[in-house]
Swiss-Prot record:
Cofactor: Mg(2+); Ca(2+)
Entry's cofactor comment: Binds 1 Mg(2+) ion per subunit. Ca(2+) may be able to substitute.
The organism's taxonomic lineage, starting at the top: Bacteria, Pseudomonadati, Pseudomonadota, Gammaproteobacteria, Enterobacterales
GO BP, one annotated term: phospholipid biosynthetic process
Class in the EC hierarchy, top level: transferase
Function: Probably phosphorylates lipids; the in vivo substrate is unknown.
Protein's recorded name: Probable lipid kinase YegS
Name of the encoding gene: yegS
Pfam families: DAGK_cat, YegS_C
Keywords: ATP-binding, Cytoplasm, Kinase, Lipid biosynthesis, Lipid metabolism, Magnesium, Metal-binding, Nucleotide-binding, Phospholipid biosynthesis, Phospholipid metabolism, Transferase
Gene3D superfamilies: 2.60.200.40, Probable inorganic polyphosphate/atp-NAD kinase, domain 1
Amino acid sequence: MAEFPASLLILNGKSTDNLPLREAIMLLREEGMTIHVRVTWEKGDAARYVEEARKLGVATVIAGGGDGTINEVSTALIQCEGDGIPALGILPLGTANDFATSVGIPEALDKALKLAIAGNAIAIDMAQVNKQTCFINMATGGFGTRITTETPEKLKAALGGVSYIIHGLMRMDTLQPDRCEIRGENFHWQGDALVIGIGNGRQAGGGQQLCPNALINDGLLQLRIFTGDEILPALVSTLKSDEDNPNIIEGASSWFDIQAPHEITFNLDGEPLSGQNFHIEILPAALRCRLPPDCLLLR
């Protein structure tokens, strides 16, 4: 194998007992690759490890975990200043792995690891909420957010993405739509939202294609709203094609403002953020990410 610059893997603490991963890393090290490994224990570790990675002079920081780990590492990378900022590599090890799946990261650990180290680094967008919190994949609100936030960890560990659907069916009788107003470039809507998806990426909640037209390097956010006064009829209506579905509202903009008369919660790559006012904007070409050549989310 050709010689490649060093990488630093930031591994979610839940994945430390992954024997196939350990074997894949050892094999690549035997082939001559320099791979540093750091394990997260608490929030803030990823940012510290990214700073360490810069001091080590590595070419890539690999996020080993789910969407939340990718979010933490990518957020730390875009906050770096100066030259020589490492690219982002992705090693999907989470429950749903929505971002990794949608951009075409291989499921096989050895192939994903090689891509993370040797893949082509492409400039991609990120999004920022209220000038503070960032997301690389999607912000979701409404029914879907409450389900992903409330689904028990043991259920997620046992069933993966299917756990969200099961928990949602169990909670259906207690959930109500969120009333809100959303504005963007040439866009304005007000009403009851069952689900809100604002995507840099395309899917969330364990494989649900909420924003099927989203691209990660077009400088735009894709918006999709599933409307409805009652949960079950609205869910049934989503089985129709988009063209015939009056319960689906779509838009595209470099920013969206959301206001609600009551507190609502958005899920940002797995992390909840509650409030009544949200300003969400795209950050064009915010970082470089190592992606497969056939990635469907590139223009």
